[in-house]
Swiss-Prot record:
Interacts with RPA2. The gene is SERTAD3. Signal peptide: none annotated. Keywords: Activator, Nucleus, Transcription, Transcription regulation. Residues 1-21, 104-125 are annotated as: Disordered. GO terms for cellular component: nucleus. Residues 26-73 form the SERTA domain. It is found in: Nucleus. InterPro entries: SERTA_dom, SERTAD3. Antiviral interferon-stimulated protein that plays a role in innate immunity and in the suppression of viruses through different mechanisms. Plays a role in the late phase response of TLR-induced immune effector expression. During influenza infection, interacts with PB2, PB1, and PA to disrupt the formation of the viral RdRp complex. Inhibits zika virus by interacting with the capsid protein in the nucleolus and reducing its abundance through proteasomal degradation. Strong transcriptional coactivator. GO terms for biological process: negative regulation of cell growth; positive regulation of DNA-templated transcription; regulation of DNA-templated transcription. This is SERTA domain-containing protein 3.
Length: 196
């Protein structure tokens, strides 16, 4: 079993402090997450056998982000790139590395060797957003991807909901019967509590 790398709590706090949770920062975070999820879906539709759990997670994330983008007021999109600050770039790089680690831990394969940007080079202009991402904002993109086809193959007819039954109560003579060890221990604990 492949183990994951643990991050220190202080590293997580520093990253959270750098994130901007204003409406614009939150929207850029959601857009970065949506772009990464779409990339993962497109890569996973390749020649290897897809993992159902992975597709369910990605599909649910995409649906939540799409619903959030529909509910949010649509601001006029400037012709400038979506990622303007180094915080957005480092956030998307962090999310991308986490998802790659998740892939390797689930698949058991070696991660692709992508060069990690050193801290000194983060001041450079981040890459332009993919046109695929802008296309993903339209509601028909997710409908064309065929993600729902994965769930049609699941046979749920054998799974019937049974009425919830109360768990059977154990016989009272087995637990805390007078004279048993547990009963004496409980009496002793109560004497200590009441005596203090």
């Amino acid at each position: 079993m492949v183990g994951g790398l643990k991050r220190k709590h202080s590293d997580l706090e520093e990253e959270e402090e750098r994130w901007e949770w204003s409406p614009a920062g939150l929207q850029s975070y959601q857009q970065a997450l949506l772009r990464i999820s779409l990339d993962k879906v497109q890569r996973s539709l390749g020649p290897r056998a897809p993992s159902l759990r992975r597709h369910v997670l990605i599909h649910n994330t995409l649906q939540q982000l799409q619903a959030a983008l529909r509910l949010a007021p649509a601001p006029a999109l400037p012709p400038e790139p979506l990622f303007l600050g180094e915080e957005d770039f480092s956030l998307s790089a962090t999310i991308g590395s986490i998802l790659r680690e998740l892939d390797t831990s689930m698949d058991g394969t070696e991660p692709p060797q992508n060069p990690v940007t050193p801290l000194g080079l983060q001041n450079e202009v981040p890459p332009q957003p993919d046109p695929v991402f802008l296309e993903a904002l339209s509601s028909r993109y997710l409908g064309d991807s065929g993600l729902d086809d994965f769930f049609l193959d699941i046979d749920t007819s054998a799974v019937e909901k049974e009425p919830a039954r109360a768990p059977p109560e154990p016989p009272h003579n087995l637990f805390c019967a007078p004279g048993s060890w547990e009963w004496n221990e409980l009496d002793h604990i109560m004497e200590i509590i009441l005596g203090s």
